């Protein structure tokens, strides 16, 4: 069930990312189209598209969706070691996506900071969408990192402790090794985003 919920979240974020991609192409093809899409909007679309597709879409689809289905199946476990932690992890990611979507409706719109998201660049650059848009984006990142860390630890413990009898680490399928390695690398990178977001907030 959690895997299906992750897939549905990935579909939703993918649709939002697709719409933002169309709007960016519209701005590039017809600059300043009737004043509907300005340069500021373009920067906001680029930033949000990158965040949604790279962080939320790919993680929800491959690690959340396929990981929840493939890991127990391939290691011979009935389910993840901590199913309730798995459920809590999903809902934290879901709330993170909801908070990020809320930044579209605040005054000034979502952040358009790009790579100047973190201080002191945000203050110096005066980027579009600064203020509430950036704060909502960073709160969303913080929730996502906490939820993903909980889910990642659950994945790792399942792979290391819930394998079927006779399955050594050397006999594990390469797909499990791939998901395990990607989870470890992501868990090394995402806490840095969390620390920077907490410093900003």
Per-segment meaning from a language model:
Residues 9-18, 89-107, 181-195:
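Hydrophobic alpha-helical membrane-insertion segments
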Residues 1-2, 18-40, 44, 61-89, ...:
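Membrane-interfacial helix termini and the short, flexible loops that connect transmembrane helices
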Residues 137-154, 188-197:
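Hydrophobic transmembrane alpha-helices and their helix-loop junctions in integral membrane proteins
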Residues 47-59, 127-148:
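Hydrophobic alpha-helical transmembrane segments
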Residues 51-60, 82-96:
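Hydrophobic alpha-helical transmembrane segments in multi-pass integral membrane proteins
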Residues 199-201:
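Conserved small/polar residues in nucleotide/adenosyl-binding loops
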């Amino acid at each position: 069930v959690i895997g299906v919920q992750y897939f549905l979240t990935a579909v939703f974020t993918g649709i939002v990312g697709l719409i933002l991609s169309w709007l960016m192409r519209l701005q590039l093809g017809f600059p300043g189209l009737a004043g509907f899409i300005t340069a500021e909007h373009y920067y906001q679309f680029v930033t949000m598209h990158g965040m949604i597709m790279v962080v939320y879409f790919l993680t929800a689809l491959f690690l959340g969706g396929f990981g929840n289905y493939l890991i127990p199946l391939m290691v011979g476990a009935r389910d993840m070691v901590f199913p309730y932690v798995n459920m809590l992890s999903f809902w934290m990611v879901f709330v993170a996506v909801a908070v990020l979507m809320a930044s579209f409706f605040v005054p000034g719109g979502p952040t358009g900071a790009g790579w100047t998201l973190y201080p002191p660049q945000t203050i110096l650059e005066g980027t579009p969408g600064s203020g509430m848009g950036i704060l909502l984006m960073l709160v969303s990142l913080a929730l996502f990192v906490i939820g993903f860390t909980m889910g990642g630890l659950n994945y790792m413990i399942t792979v290391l402790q819930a394998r079927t009898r006779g399955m050594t680490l050397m006999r594990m399928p390469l797909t499990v090794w791939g998901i395990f390695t990607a989870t470890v690398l992501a868990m090394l990178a995402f806490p840095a985003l969390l620390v920077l977001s907490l410093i900003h907030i």
